[in-house]
């Protein structure tokens, strides 16, 4: 199986505090990899390394190696804007731009110069909304504000916005934590459909969600990677006692 992204001996420091302690983890292509663990364990910090979002935090320092298709994404010649188009992100709370539904999706392809005509832009917007399972619900109201949508629809709009720039990887940081069970189920179905075209890494507090949507799971605890493996194996016969204790609810 092809490895799309790889972290090798990744350490993250916030000032003098070491938040991640030498994480080595492979992200397989066209699979969903779930990062689980109790609050404050480092899973979101590690996720943000994959598209250099930690660069925006004052005092943050990253050591080790992170590669995308074998290329070090922290090399000085890397264009971070281009990297974040290749490695998109969906955040915990739905965060549509204060623009129309259409413009939320059109914004990325337009600023990245991915379309040559208005017709092509319309095609990209429609395709992205369809992939996000949202087009039929909004096709007659594309001019309305993205913020007018329900929470679940807003999160699917954010997913459409991410995929409109043709990323290779989509990072999701607890994308369902602010959603009700019905909206969560829609997002989970969408994640499963999207992995045909994208590599997905999802941070989740929900063990049930990790079991439903992922093929691989990595367990974090106190800034360390405890274990990683196929999700089914991890949830039925984990190697580490800390993993067993976490997935059975003994701590977390």
Curated annotation (Swiss-Prot):
GO molecular function: ATP binding; ATP hydrolysis activity; ATPase-coupled phosphate ion transmembrane transporter activity
Protein name stated in the entry: Phosphate import ATP-binding protein PstB
Function: Part of the ABC transporter complex PstSACB involved in phosphate import. Responsible for energy coupling to the transport system.
Domain of life of the native organism: Bacteria
Record-linked InterPro entries: AAA+_ATPase (IPR003593), ABC_transporter-like_ATP-bd (IPR003439), ABC_transporter-like_CS (IPR017871), P-loop_NTPase (IPR027417), PstB-like (IPR005670)
Sequence intervals crossing the membrane: none
Organism: Bartonella henselae (strain ATCC 49882 / DSM 28221 / CCUG 30454 / Houston 1)
Gene coding for it: pstB
Membrane topology: Peripheral membrane protein
Reactions listed under catalytic activity: phosphate(out) + ATP + H2O = ADP + 2 phosphate(in) + H(+)
Enzyme Commission (EC) number: 7.3.2.1
